[in-house]
Amino acid sequence: MKLDGYTRLAAVVANPIKHSISPFIHNRAFEATATNGAYVAWEIEASDLAETVANIRRYQMFGINLSMPYKEQVIPYLDELSDEARLIGAVNTVVNENGNLIGYNTDGKGFFKCLPSFTISGKKMTLLGAGGAAKSILAQAILDGVSQISVFVRSVSMEKTRPYLDKLQEQTGFKVDLCALEYVSELQARIAESDLLVNATSVGMDGQSSPVPENIVLPETLLVADIIYQPFETPFLKWARSQGNPAVNGLGMLLYQAAEAFQLWTGKEMPTEEIWQSLTEKYQ
């Protein structure tokens, strides 16, 4: 990697973040595209967020990525928001356009790009969870023309989830069905008519638990996706594959949301196939 007086910085900002795979992805991309850039991880306190954003202008950076807990907190410090960032209410990418800081959310686009030979337009989706990743997938699905979305959360989370779905309906005219995860018969019925089933919860990161009961029967044509990428195969994905269904983990989402950010910063396409090979060799 070339480092000199002309090198431009990009960074991922979060807390914690030292475990991040993003520097590996972006620095490989800078090198592969002969871009004079370097990407680092900044673990900061909330009190340093305003100054960190100011440094994007000060040091003429490409921009930054954001992860928890700063995806929403960063918004007041930005000059503009993209349509999807406004709809989601969260930003994962800030682009420095000649000192004008624009917030984007590439998570949803990254998720749908990682699905093999699948487009969400006109399809039905069942989504487990309603956190930050789920919101980005929800909003992008609506923007891309999904025909039906069923969101399942634990009954204790229903009240907290409904206001966001109501806001989405106000802004887009699209009604999302909200259901309790404990109602297994309803979960089975929704999955049976779906084209895509997504686990957007953290259940399965322990390598042992699954967000759905194992007696759920999956339709043959259903594509199953999990946003988790460590472990590489969660119990949820293993269960789906045991029924003969195609199943995708979250590593592709991580790569393709990064590719969207990289293009916004540099105007260049990230060589995703080459980097995917490096990623799977390193993290599988």
From Swiss-Prot:
Q: What is its EC number?
A: 1.1.1.25
Tell me which species this is from.
Answer: Streptococcus pneumoniae (strain CGSP14)
Known catalytic reactions? shikimate + NADP(+) = 3-dehydroshikimate + NADPH + H(+)
Major enzyme class: oxidoreductase
Query: What does UniProt list as this organism's lineage?
Result: Bacteria, Bacillati, Bacillota, Bacilli, Lactobacillales
- So where does this one cross the membrane? none
Q: What is this protein called?
A: Shikimate dehydrogenase (NADP(+))
Q: What domain of life does the native source organism fall in?
A: Bacteria
Matches recorded under InterPro entries: Aminoacid_DH-like_N_sf, NAD(P)-bd_dom_sf, SDH_C, Shikimate_DH, Shikimate_DH-bd_N, Shikimate_DH_fam
Protein function: Involved in the biosynthesis of the chorismate, which leads to the biosynthesis of aromatic amino acids. Catalyzes the reversible NADPH linked reduction of 3-dehydroshikimate (DHSA) to yield shikimate (SA).
Which terms in the Gene Ontology molecular function aspect does this entry carry? Answer: NADP binding; shikimate 3-dehydrogenase (NADP+) activity
Annotated S-S bridges: none
Q: Where does shikimate bind?
A: S20, I21, S22, S67, N92, D107, Y229
Active-site residues (renumbered): K71 (proton acceptor)
Which keywords has UniProt assigned to this entry? Amino-acid biosynthesis, Aromatic amino acid biosynthesis, NADP, Oxidoreductase
Q: Into which family does the record put it? A: Belongs to the shikimate dehydrogenase family.
Task: Please provide the Gene Ontology terms (biological process) for this protein.
Answer: amino acid biosynthetic process; aromatic amino acid family biosynthetic process; chorismate biosynthetic process; shikimate metabolic process
Pathway listed? Metabolic intermediate biosynthesis; chorismate biosynthesis; chorismate from D-erythrose 4-phosphate and phosphoenolpyruvate: step 4/7
Assembly and binders = Homodimer.
Gene3D superfamilies associated with the record:
Leucine Dehydrogenase, chain A, domain 1, NAD(P)-binding Rossmann-like Domain
Which residues does NADP(+) bind?
D83, G129, A130, G131, G132, A133, I227, G250
Sorted alphabetically, which Pfam families does this protein's record hold? SDH_C, Shikimate_dh_N
